[in-house]
């Protein structure tokens, strides 16, 4: 199955892209894709990530389906 992965802010900088399309096996959890991305792009692992699946906040254990959109971003804070 194919998953569109969108990167925002620091996650885009860490990966060097705003969007990637990844192949995944059926019943893959979002965390599995994030772990693989972190191995391929070690700078990504330095960030505490928030995720959304199909434009809704999601848990890392969310099972992805073919054609889903996984968005990765960091929490925004100010001071």
Per-range role (PLM):
Residues 1-78:
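Ubiquitin-like/PB1-type beta-grasp interaction modules and other compact soluble beta-rich domains
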């Amino acid at each position: 199955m194919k998953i569109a992965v969108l990167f925002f802010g620091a996650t885009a900088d860490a990966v060097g892209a705003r969007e990637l399309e990844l192949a995944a096996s059926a019943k893959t959890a979002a965390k599995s894709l994030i772990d693989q991305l972190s191995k391929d792009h070690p700078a990504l692992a330095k960030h505490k990530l928030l995720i959304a699946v199909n434009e809704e906040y999601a848990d890392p254990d969310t099972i992805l389906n073919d054609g889903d959109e996984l968005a990765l971003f960091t929490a925004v804070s100010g001071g």
